[in-house]
């Protein structure tokens, strides 16, 4: 299944594809219906809007593929459609025939609206609690029943709703507790998200009487229990909806989980906890539970949760979706808005498709079922109406409030209404009418949210059931009445919905209610007049309604009729009412009024355009000058164009009119200058007019800067307020434009000001083109004067106006010659010395120069007479003359003058003043440079605009260098993208001019420069000679490193910005050329084709690159790179007619991929990726046929690097488009993940991470067109491989070709199949089966088989790559004998050499190593004899207990990783022991680079997981930790195989783990207290220290505490501080330090052994003699320290239990003798006990002769203890294994268990039984497999979620305290306006209803 893709899919396309695939599963497997729905249901509760929407879509598609439920289909009648239902059908008589329906069904006729509003529980965003804690303990079915029962009360239909007290006094009463005996029956636990299993056992008061508690204590207990419930309910649970009823029966589970049975009170563990072997909570008392694990019972058939329960007579007769809809209907009233939203969307989809079957039952007649269906649907309608009334959640994200719940419920109601009979629709309408009117609901005051909800419901009713509106006049009248009431409502959101309600039925209304049109239009126009609040968001909706209505002739006729009666109702009077809203505060309103005006302009008929006059023209043009939103600006220009068309049609430009008086001020405003940051130049506000036509007062133009809050550009809806007055919109409407009018560049931005000038120029160009030519001279005079204006921005605007006019008129215009004469001086002559609008920069430069001179005077004491005098007035000032301060004056001061004055200083003056002089000069130089740059930029802009105008006028001189330079400078340096785009257009026009003329002129040079500029950005086009020496590198990786290391970062960034600007301009010009010339591009501009094609052919024609290509003076290499880069840049704009030309170049690009130079491969890879994205079929065919074979070229690393780099870029360029081809790429890339080249490996790993995400979606994509049959067959083979890799159960059975002397169990055969699969595809993995499942045997099978197959292949082919090679087994010393024995037993035909023992013995064996089949050695020997083992090429390198290489810095780890082998395999039952960083080290051995570098892994996984452990971690840290664990688990999943014993061994008896607590002795307690008092302060000071000595001190203290827990004899020795004191104490007690009385663990050990029958006297009766007596149990006793074993041996066995026969295995036993001791213990039952240290006896040994395991001490590493206990609990064990852990109560040992628990949780989450193959993991989870990061660049960056809080600041800007939670930390993900617009588009909804 792909259900998780609904949540994790990165794009809507992926999520929608996942939804479609789930639907396809339903189509192919109809029996999977309820499983699929159960999987998807939890995603409806997601916090993510996109996830909920995708889940709802998936449900809709699945339900659509399910059979329609019609129990009466055999009757031969179809279910009657609601649309055909007659209003007057009387079905009352039929109803009477039926038995009464369930009382829980609500009826529309009896719905008590006043009670619901009075008593119903309000539905807000969240009730402050995410779960009903009191329901958390119920199973899903019980919870659903309870919620259904209480729903009537929550709706207010049973009086006032009072929340239940979560925990009342009765809950505190002690209940009798039945003591349970240990049992091996455990029920499988399942939960639905938000619920859990029982949380805690009944609370038992200490004194047994609840009456003994005071009221305060009872309240305290309530709070504690409430908190406990909350904690339980909020835990994250694995969602599993696959079973509903199974848990109700006490049966044996199909998969058991570790299950605790309390020995004291039978309390159950939380159902959501991990399989955990340790319990910690000290505050809850001793954990004396028994954990029963690993018992495999018979399977229990499970029914999906959502599947209706079968009855005794057969399948459930009800509608199959009834149970799911019950759950969703309860969720409709959840306190959390996201849950309500998801439920409403899902109900919408189900009802839309399957609503006709709802409520129907098998066995009823058609008539009866029709009634049942109507009643069920009526009930749902009632509930939806209740939500519309009770919901109060609104989102003020946009201009209008969006109520997502009410909107979605409205859509659900719409879907429902399409299924309802007419009678019910009328009932729904009546309820909605009452909700809107609110006249009979008993409300003290109207509630706007209720009215809003009712109006939304009415909107969808109107849209869906137009048929009833047409039939029923009363219904139409009622709707109109409600809408008119809504349009007059005090709340603007209600007005907005009311207007939107009428839009879908506008046509029907106009045709059927012509008599009321006049009234309605009056109301609509009055609604606009009465809008008082400047934030009234409804204005846009009202205008849209108005525009829609005015498209009907009937409405226009009605308006004309109104106008005849009342002149105030004419178009000329009404339309101007819209003008105030042109500059409304809210963007959507400004947009709506423009849409309305556009509609009015397009109307035809007499009198419809009488409102168009000079004032209208002026107001629209003012929009262009002050509008900051680009979308509204474009609309304004469209309205302007339509306005000019209307005026031209009327002939307004032909005669002298009042237009001229309006146009001149507009020209003045258009050419007005604007300033620079900090020095604004305001517009002349007196030239603006108000909507009334009066001039705009300049005093109101600019808002005060001191109160920015009053000038927010977009209004934000805040408190609703009702205005009693009805006046015209206030004159402050222009406040939205205050900053534009003031010219406030700091707030508005220079780009926005420039854009307004550009649009104004376009508008004036259009106006001048249509204006009567005879009236133009006066206008042109004003414009041409602007070309000589003192401000650069005025000159720019004038030139742009001329250009826009010329584009329309061409060179033939009457004024062309005049315009050209005025423009040429700008291009050819000198520019003015300075511009007035940038004079401020010169003032700053002068001030800094003056400061420099003052510094000479004050610090260097230079006489004033020697200092130059600076003019006060600067150039650009209005009164500036020829002697004003200029830029050259400034340059003289900081240059010659500075040097002259410095030379005149005495040595003493230099010493004291030189530093400050240099600093002041640097400041002045910076100011001068800034002034110079600004001046050059303004010159460039004016020249470029003038050049563009001359080109548009076709005034191209014979020597066009000045024109070309003007435009090309803009292409190179213009920072403003729109001005640069204009220059690109002008260049295109110039090239077109020359291509149509006889001479080509400078075209080739222009094209050459554009290509050069396009390739100047080294981040896109690398420098050839700079990278020419790189051969075995992948530049895609190197370039990311280069970007980070630059000595002068500021200079680098400045140069990089300049290069980006130049490339952007050149790329724009080339793209415009491609669009302009289309398929003729290469013919019209042959130089472009030559620049791309020639270098490729010249450099790549031969097999080798030209020998001199690296010569510094040779440009061919750079030309190749530039050609590829240029093709990549402009290819997306190519006409399809040019594609064959590109395809002809593909072989050369492929050849470039094989090039030995990294830089050419890089350029070719990026170019090839772009070609594939544009010309997909031909490109991908070439990829599969030519590029992919290169990736396996073992002889040439350049081929592999080129191919993998190409795939890397292809993935990122094509994104979703690569889906049909993804299967071709996975296997080749996978093979390179273990490449010998590090860079190939890294890039392959990164690419594979992205590719595998898409594999689940690939199957549903249709075959790509154009691929050959051969390729399609190849794709099927690749699919088979992927299926095997992702599901171990699909791996082909591997027949072992050699005679293994063992019968493999089925799971062992599966393991060998998996190992053979890895072998076949040269993959490497970890076999991490549970301890005792035969990893050794499986390994022997695959190694022996591979040796045999290689020998056969070599005999047949004599190929050196399959020659005989030895395999190496590396294991702990204890297991070397074990491996020898296993090999001898199972594969005696293999020649095995044990490379162990002392150096002399190993030296003797060295010559035999290359010829052996198997070499067994240890990790230490690998480290010591590295020079012996390294030179040998091994076939297999197997690391047994591979977790021993967990420390990547250990010498043994480094040595092992240097070994060379064909196949690498790790065996480990516990691959993660302490932290996840260990897993990185393991994979660094298997596939270096697969998990990134150690630092990346640490940041991405290890740190978040570790940070989430701390109790003070924030919820975001905890979430980051959980996500990191899950991501890591998925990433390593395909390369680990793990099976648990309880899964695969039916015959393995259970293992019971129990804690055995001992109270510390008096002596121990005394020593503890003394140590704590004396050492605690010192230890606290040293915690966190990085000093080695401090760390050692802490470690020694911990060791002291651990030893003391065991026996005081281990710590109290001579030299101990309390030695004498202890001796005195012992003397007084007549005891000694080794007495078991002082070490309770020893006496506890004795008691345990005796209880087990070990050490008891032999039976005195019967036929057994003492000599022949054998104990019923045999034990393994584990200690950490050999010293403790000595004490156990001497004090317990020798003194207390002398009859016990025992063996001992610790570090003092030679490695070669250890297996003998194991064999003796297993075969000789007379030995009762085996004493072991955990380090020696805890790994790999088979000790099934014992059935009792006792831990006297515990390891910090929990996996070591688990490993040790599983020495007995493994294959071959016939008895129940009891594990006892001796724990000294209240000591450090309990802390150790706490730490163990966390480590086990992490390990079991990352590596668990899902690693049995991806078949056990939903394919939905595959999306985020291998998520190393999107690119190599992001992979190197540390994750933000790593829990690092250093230097973080909180919301107030203060430095955040570590671990402290901010008040916004838990804020959920924000959703955006786009989601609302997409979801609540009425047209889209209606389309789905039809579909």
Swiss-Prot record:
One GO term describing the cellular component: transcription regulator complex
EC id: 3.6.4.-
Record's keyword terms, sorted: ATP-binding, DNA-binding, Helicase, Hydrolase, Nucleotide-binding, Nucleus, Repeat, Transcription, Transcription regulation
Positions with biased composition (Low complexity): 699-710
SUPFAM superfamilies: ARM repeat (SSF48371), P-loop containing nucleoside triphosphate hydrolases (SSF52540)
Domain of life: Eukaryota
Domain Helicase C-terminal: 1663-1813
Ranges for region Disordered: 184-216, 241-283, 295-316, 699-740
HEAT repeat start and end residues: 30-68, 473-511, 569-606, 957-996, 1139-1177, 1181-1216, 1219-1257, 1526-1565
Subcellular localization(s) per the UniProt record: Nucleus
This protein's record includes keyword Transferase: no
Enzyme type, top EC level: hydrolase
Residue spans of biased composition, Basic and acidic residues class: 264-275
Motif placement: DEAH box: 1440-1443
Biological processes per GO annotation: negative regulation of DNA-templated transcription; nucleolar large rRNA transcription by RNA polymerase I; regulation of RNA polymerase II transcription preinitiation complex assembly; rRNA processing
Residue sites binding ATP per the record: 1329-1336
PROSITE patterns per the UniProt record, alphabetical: HELICASE_ATP_BIND_1, HELICASE_CTER
Gene3D superfamilies, per database record: Leucine-rich Repeat Variant (1.25.10.10), P-loop containing nucleotide triphosphate hydrolases (3.40.50.300), Tandem AAA-ATPase domain (3.40.50.10810)
Pfam families linked: DUF3535 (PF12054), Helicase_C (PF00271), SNF2-rel_dom (PF00176)
Family: Belongs to the SNF2/RAD54 helicase family.
Oligomer status and interactors: Forms the NCT transcriptional regulatory complex with nctA and nctB.
Protein known as: TATA-binding protein-associated factor mot1
Organism: Aspergillus fumigatus (strain CBS 144.89 / FGSC A1163 / CEA10)
């Amino acid at each position: 299944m792909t259900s998780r893709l609904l949540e994790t899919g990165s794009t809507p396309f992926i999520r929608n594809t996942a939804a479609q695939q789930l639907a396809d599963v339903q189509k192919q497997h109809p029996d999977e219906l309820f499983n699929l729905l159960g999987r998807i249901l939890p995603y409806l509760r997601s916090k993510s809007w996109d996830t909920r929407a995708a889940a709802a879509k998936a449900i809709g598609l699945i339900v659509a593929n399910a059979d329609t439920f019609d129990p009466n289909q055999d009757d031969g009648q179809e279910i009657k459609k609601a649309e055909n239902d007659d209003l007057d059908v009387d079905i009352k008589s039929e109803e009477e025939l039926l038995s009464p329906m369930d009382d829980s069904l609500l009826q529309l006729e009896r719905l008590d609206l006043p009670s619901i509003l009075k008593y119903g529980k309000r539905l807000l965003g969240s009730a402050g609690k995410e779960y009903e804690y009191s329901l958390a303990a119920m199973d899903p079915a019980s919870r659903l029943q309870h919620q259904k029962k209480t729903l009537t009360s929550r709706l207010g239909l049973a009086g006032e709703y009072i929340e239940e007290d979560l925990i009342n006094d009765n809950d505190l009463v002690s209940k009798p507790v039945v003591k349970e005996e240990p049992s091996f029956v455990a029920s499988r636990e399942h939960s639905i998200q938000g619920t859990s299993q029982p949380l805690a056992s009944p609370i038992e008061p200490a004194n047994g009487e609840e009456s003994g508690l005071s009221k305060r204590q009872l309240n305290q207990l309530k709070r504690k229990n409430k908190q406990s419930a909350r904690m339980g309910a909020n835990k994250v649970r694995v969602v599993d909806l696959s079973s509903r009823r199974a848990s109700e029966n006490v049966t044996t589970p199909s998969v058991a989980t570790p299950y605790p049975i309390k020995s004291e009170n039978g309390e159950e563990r939380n159902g959501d906890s991990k399989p955990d072997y340790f319990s910690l909570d000290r505050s809850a008392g001793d954990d004396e539970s028994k954990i029963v694990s690993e018992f495999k019972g018979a399977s229990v058939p499970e029914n999906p949760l959502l599947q209706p329960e079968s009855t005794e007579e057969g399948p459930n007769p009800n509608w199959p979706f009834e149970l799911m809809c019950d759950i969703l209907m309860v969720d409709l009233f959840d306190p959390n808005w996201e849950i309500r939203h998801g439920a409403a969307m899902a109900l919408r989809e189900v009802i839309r498709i399957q609503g006709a079957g709802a409520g129907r039952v098998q066995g009823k007649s058609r008539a009866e079922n029709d009634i049942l269906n109507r009643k069920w649907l009526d009930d749902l309608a009632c509930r939806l109406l209740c939500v519309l009334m009770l919901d109060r959640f609104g989102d003020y994200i946009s201009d209008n409030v969006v109520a997502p719940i009410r909107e979605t419920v409205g859509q659900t109601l719409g879907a429902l209404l399409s299924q309802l009979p007419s009678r019910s629709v009328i009932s729904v309408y009546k309820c909605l009418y009452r909700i809107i009117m609110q006249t009979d609901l008993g409300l003290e005051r109207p509630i706007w949210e209720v009215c809003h909800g009712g109006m939304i419901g009415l909107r969808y009713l109107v849209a869906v059931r137009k048929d009833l509106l047409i039939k029923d006049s009363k219904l139409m009248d009622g709707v109109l009445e409600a809408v008119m009431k809504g349009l007059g409502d005090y709340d603007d959101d209600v007005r907005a919905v009311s207007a939107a309600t009428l839009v879908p039925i506008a046509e029907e209304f106009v045709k059927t209610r012509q008599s009321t049109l006049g009234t309605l239009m009056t109301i609509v126009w009055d609604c606009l007049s009465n809008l008082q609040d400047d934030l009234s968001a409804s204005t846009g909706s009202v205008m849209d309604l108005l525009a829609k209505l005015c498209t009907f002739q009937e409405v226009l006729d009605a308006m004309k009729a109104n106008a005849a009666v009342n002149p105030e109702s004419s178009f000329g009077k009404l339309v101007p009412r819209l003008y105030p809203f042109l500059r409304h505060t809210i963007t959507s309103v400004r947009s709506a009024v423009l849409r309305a005006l556009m509609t009015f302009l397009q109307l035809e008929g007499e009198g419809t355009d009488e409102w168009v006059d000079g004032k209208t023209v002026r107001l629209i043009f003012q929009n262009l000058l002050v509008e900051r939103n680009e979308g509204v600006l474009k609309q304004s220009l469209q309205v302007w164009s339509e306005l000019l068309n209307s005026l031209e049609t009327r002939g307004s430009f032909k005669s002298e009119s009042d237009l001229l008086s309006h146009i001149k001020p507009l020209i003045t405003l258009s050419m007005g200058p604007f300033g620079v940051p900090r020095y604004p130049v305001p517009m002349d506000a007196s030239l603006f007019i108000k909507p009334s036509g009066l001039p705009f007062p300049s005093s109101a133009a600019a808002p005060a800067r001191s109160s920015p809050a009053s000038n927010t550009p977009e209004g934000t809806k805040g408190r609703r307020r009702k205005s009693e007055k009805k006046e015209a919109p206030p004159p402050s409407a222009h406040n939205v434009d205050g900053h534009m009018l003031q010219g406030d560049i700091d707030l508005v931005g220079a780009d926005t000001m420039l854009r307004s000038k550009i649009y104004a120029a376009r508008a004036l160009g259009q106006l001048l083109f249509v204006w009567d030519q005879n009236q133009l001279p006066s206008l042109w005079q004003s414009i041409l004067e602007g070309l000589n204006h003192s401000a650069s921005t005025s000159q720019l605007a004038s030139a742009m106006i001329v250009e826009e006019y010329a584009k329309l008129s061409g060179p033939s215009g009457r004024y062309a010659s005049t315009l050209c004469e005025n423009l040429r001086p700008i291009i050819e002559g000198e520019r003015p010395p300075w511009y007035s609008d940038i004079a401020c920069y010169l003032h700053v430069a002068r001030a800094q120069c003056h400061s420099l001179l003052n510094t000479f005077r004050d610090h260097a004491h230079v006489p004033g007479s020697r200092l130059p005098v600076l003019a006060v007035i600067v150039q650009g000032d209005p009164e500036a003359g020829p002697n004003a301060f200029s830029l050259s004056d400034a340059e003289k001061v900081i240059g010659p003058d500075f040097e002259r004055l410095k030379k005149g200083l005495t040595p003493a003056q230099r010493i004291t003043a030189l530093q400050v002089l240099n600093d002041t000069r640097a400041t002045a130089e910076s100011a001068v440079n800034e002034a110079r740059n600004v001046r050059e930029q303004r010159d460039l802009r004016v020249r470029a605009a003038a050049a563009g105008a001359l080109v548009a006028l076709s005034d191209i001189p014979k020597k066009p260098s000045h024109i070309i330079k003007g435009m090309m400078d803009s292409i190179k340096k213009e920072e403003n993208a729109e001005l640069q785009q204009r220059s690109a257009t002008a260049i295109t026009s110039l090239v077109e001019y020359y291509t149509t003329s006889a001479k080509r002129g400078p075209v080739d040079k222009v094209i050459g420069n554009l290509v050069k500029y396009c390739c100047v950005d080294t981040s896109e086009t690398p420098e050839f000679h700079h990278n020419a020496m790189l051969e075995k590198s992948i530049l895609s990786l190197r370039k990311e490193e280069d970007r980070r290391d630059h000595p002068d970062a500021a200079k680098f960034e400045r140069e990089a910005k300049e290069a980006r600007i130049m490339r952007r301009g050149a790329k724009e010009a080339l793209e415009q050329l491609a669009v302009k010339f289309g398929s003729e591009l290469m013919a019209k501009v042959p130089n472009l084709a030559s620049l791309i094609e020639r270098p490729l052919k010249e450099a790549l024609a031969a097999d080798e690159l030209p020998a001199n290509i690296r010569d510094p003076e040779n440009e061919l290499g750079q030309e190749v790179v530039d050609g590829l880069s240029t093709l990549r840049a402009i290819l997306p704009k190519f006409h399809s007619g040019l594609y064959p030309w590109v395809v002809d170049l593909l072989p050369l690009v492929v050849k470039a991929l094989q090039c030995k130079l990294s830089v050419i491969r890089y350029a070719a890879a990026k170019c090839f990726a772009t070609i594939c994205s544009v010309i997909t079929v031909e490109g991908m065919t070439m990829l599969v046929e030519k590029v992919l074979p290169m990736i396996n070229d073992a002889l040439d690393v350049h081929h592999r690097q080129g191919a993998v780099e190409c795939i890397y870029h292809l993935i990122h360029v094509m994104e979703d488009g690569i889906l049909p081809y993804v299967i071709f790429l996975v296997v080749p890339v996978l093979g390179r993940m273990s490449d010998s080249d590090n860079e190939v490996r890294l890039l392959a790993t990164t690419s594979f991470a992205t590719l595998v995400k898409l594999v689940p979606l690939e199957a549903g994509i249709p075959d790509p067109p154009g691929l050959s049959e051969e390729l399609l067959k190849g794709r099927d083979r690749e699919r088979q491989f992927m299926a095997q890799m992702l599901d171990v159960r699909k791996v082909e059975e591997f027949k072992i070709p050699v005679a293994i002397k063992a019968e493999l169990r089925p799971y062992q055969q599966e393991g060998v199949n998996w190992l053979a699969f890895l072998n076949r595809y040269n993959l490497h993995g970890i076999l991490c089966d549970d301890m005792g499942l035969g990893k050794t045997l499986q390994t022997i099978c695959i190694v022996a088989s591979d040796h045999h197959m290689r020998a056969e292949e070599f005999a047949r082919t004599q190929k050196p790559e399959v020659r005989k090679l030895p395999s190496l087994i590396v294991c702990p010393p204890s297991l070397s004998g074990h491996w020898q024995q296993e090999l001898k037993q199972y594969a005696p035909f293999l020649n095995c050499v044990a490379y162990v023992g002392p150096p002399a013995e190993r030296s003797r064996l060295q010559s035999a190593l290359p010829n052996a089949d198997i070499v067994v050695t240890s990790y230490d020997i690998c480290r010591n004899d590295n020079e012996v083992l390294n030179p040998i090429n091994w076939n297999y390198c197997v690391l047994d207990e591979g977790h021993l290489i967990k420390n990547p810095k250990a010498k043994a780890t480094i040595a092992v990783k240097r070994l060379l082998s064909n196949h690498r395999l790790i065996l480990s039952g516990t691959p993660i022991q302490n932290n996840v960083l260990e897993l990185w080290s393991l994979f660094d051995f298997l596939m270096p680079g697969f998990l990134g570098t150690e630092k990346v892994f640490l940041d991405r996984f290890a740190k978040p997981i570790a940070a989430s452990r701390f109790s003070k971690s924030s919820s975001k840290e905890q979430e980051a930790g959980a996500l990191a664990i899950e991501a890591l688990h998925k990433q390593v999943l395909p390369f680990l195989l793990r099976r648990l014993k309880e899964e695969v061994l039916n015959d393995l008896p259970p293992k019971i783990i129990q804690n055995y607590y001992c109270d510390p002795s008096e002596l121990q307690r005394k020593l503890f207290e003394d140590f704590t008092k004396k050492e605690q302060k010192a230890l606290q000071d040293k915690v966190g220290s990085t000093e080695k000595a401090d760390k050692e001190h802490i470690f020694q203290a911990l060791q002291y505490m651990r030893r003391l827990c065991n026996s005081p004899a281990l710590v109290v020795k001579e030299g101990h501080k309390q030695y004498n004191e202890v001796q005195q104490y012992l003397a007084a007690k007549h005891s000694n330090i080794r007495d078991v009385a002082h070490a309770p663990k020893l006496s506890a050990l004795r008691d345990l052994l005796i209880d087990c029958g070990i050490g008891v006297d032999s039976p005195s009766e019967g036929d057994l003699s003492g000599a022949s007596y054998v104990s019923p149990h045999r034990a393994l006793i584990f200690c950490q320290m050999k010293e403790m074993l000595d004490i156990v041996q001497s004090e317990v066995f020798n003194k207390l239990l002398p009859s016990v026969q025992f063996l001992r295995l610790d570090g003092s036993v030679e490695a070669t003798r250890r297996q003998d001791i194991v064999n003796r213990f297993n075969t000789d039952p007379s030995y009762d006990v085996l004493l072991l240290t955990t380090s020696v006896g805890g790994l790999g040994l088979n000790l099934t002769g014992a059935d009792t395991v006792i831990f006297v001490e515990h390891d910090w590493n929990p996996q070591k203890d688990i490993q040790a206990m599983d020495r007995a609990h493994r294959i071959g064990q016939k008895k129940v294994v009891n594990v006892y852990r001796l724990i000294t109560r209240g000591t450090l040992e309990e802390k150790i268990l706490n730490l163990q628990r966390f480590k086990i949780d992490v390990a079991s989450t990352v590596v668990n039984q899902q690693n049995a193959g991806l078949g056990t993991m939903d394919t939905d989870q595959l999306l985020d497999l291998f998520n190393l990061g999107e690119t190599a660049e992001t992979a190197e960056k540390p994750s933000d979620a790593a829990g690092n809080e250093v230097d973080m600041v909180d919301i107030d800007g203060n430095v955040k305290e570590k671990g402290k939670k901010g008040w916004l930390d838990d804020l959920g993900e924000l959703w955006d306006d786009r989601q609302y617009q997409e979801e609540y588009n009425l047209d889209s909804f209606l389309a789905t209803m039809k579909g």
